[in-house]
């Protein structure tokens, strides 16, 4: 089996090294990742300039583009490697709730899913760098189960690993997406020339961390698995919308 691996933190990140190392014990691996951190770019494509594919000394390939670009490159240019699965991550920081709309990590998996390839996004609910041992141990558990009976149809799973010691991981829970409050996150500043500039600041606080959500269960020490879908149609609103637009 062949697994294409990407991320949004870049090919030099600790998370992608862990993901590639563990996955290589179960399958053939090829890494195609952005050359630098592309967090928050979602499913964007690079359309205004050409892309370059290069190979690093560690064997990883990197692209001067987005995670979505990397999936297209990875599936298009290698005659000797066609992915059976796509793994994205391990992201340095959670991708839960609304985060999934912005995440390049989730976007790489989403793009693969749109191509008909089963895909999984992995994230660690920590940005301090203290819990990579937990992430690696969790990954061994997850992939041993995954490859024992691999999914046969396209799936899109979002997995978050808790920020606890390896021995304190409480198991795996299937969870729905939670929600964040919208952050007031535009921060004004001045550049060295005195010109007005703006920074996009931190995300908002979590507003839905109830039991059964990814925020709630991962915060309680569980690995969370959330099945995602691409169809954004609000089916319960179809009749009401039709009544509005078809009214005399």
Curated annotation (Swiss-Prot):
Source species, domain of life: Bacteria
Hydrolase recorded as keyword: yes
The record's free-text note on cofactor binding: Binds 1 divalent metal cation per subunit.
UniProt KW keywords: Cytoplasm, Hydrolase, Metal-binding, Nucleotide-binding
Subcellular localization(s) per the UniProt record: Cytoplasm
Pfam families on file: SurE
Record-level GO cellular component terms: cytoplasm
Enzyme Commission no: 3.1.3.5
GO molecular function, one term: metal ion binding
Alphabetized SUPFAM superfamilies for the sequence: SurE-like
Known cofactor(s): a divalent metal cation
InterPro entries hit by this protein: SurE, SurE-like_Pase/nucleotidase, SurE-like_sf
First-level EC class: hydrolase
Annotated positions binding a divalent metal cation: 8-9, 39, 91
Main location: cytoplasm
Catalysed reactions, semicolon-separated: a ribonucleoside 5'-phosphate + H2O = a ribonucleoside + phosphate
Protein function: Nucleotidase that shows phosphatase activity on nucleoside 5'-monophosphates.
PANTHER family the UniProt entry points to: 5'-NUCLEOTIDASE SURE, 5'_3'-NUCLEOTIDASE SURE
Family stated for the protein in its record: Belongs to the SurE nucleotidase family.
UniProt-recorded name of the protein: 5'-nucleotidase SurE
Species annotation: Neisseria meningitidis serogroup B (strain ATCC BAA-335 / MC58)
Taxonomy of the source species: Bacteria, Pseudomonadati, Pseudomonadota, Betaproteobacteria, Neisseriales
Annotated gene: surE
């Amino acid at each position: 089996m062949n697994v294409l691996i990407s991320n949004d933190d870049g090919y030099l990140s600790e998370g992608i090294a862990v993901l590639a190392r563990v996955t290589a014990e179960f399958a053939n691996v090829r890494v195609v990742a952005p050359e630098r951190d592309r967090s928050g770019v979602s499913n964007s494509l690079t359309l205004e300039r050409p892309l370059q594919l290069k190979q690093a000394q560690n064997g990883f390939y990197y692209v001067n583009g987005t995670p979505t670009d990397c999936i297209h490159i990875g599936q298009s240019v290698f005659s000797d490697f066609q992915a059976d699965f796509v793994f994205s991550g391990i992201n340095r920081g959670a991708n839960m709730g609304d985060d999934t709309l912005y995440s390049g990590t989730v976007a790489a998996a989403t793009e693969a899913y749109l191509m008909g390839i089963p895909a999984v996004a992995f994230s660690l609910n920590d940005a301090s760098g203290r819990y990579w041992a937990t992430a690696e141990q969790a990954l061994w558990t997850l992939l041993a189960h995954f490859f024992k009976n691999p999914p046969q149809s396209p799936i899109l799973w979002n997995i978050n690993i808790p920020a606890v010691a390896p021995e304190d991981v409480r198991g795996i829970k299937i969870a729905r997406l939670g929600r964040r409050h919208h952050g007031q996150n535009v921060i004004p500043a001045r550049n060295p020339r005195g010109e007005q500039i703006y920074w996009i600041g931190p995300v908002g606080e979590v507003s839905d961390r109830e039991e059964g959500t990814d925020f709630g269960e991962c915060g309680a020490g569980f690995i969370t698995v959330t099945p995602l879908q691409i169809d954004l149609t609000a089916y319960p609103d179809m009749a009401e919308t039709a009544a509005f637009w078809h009214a005399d």
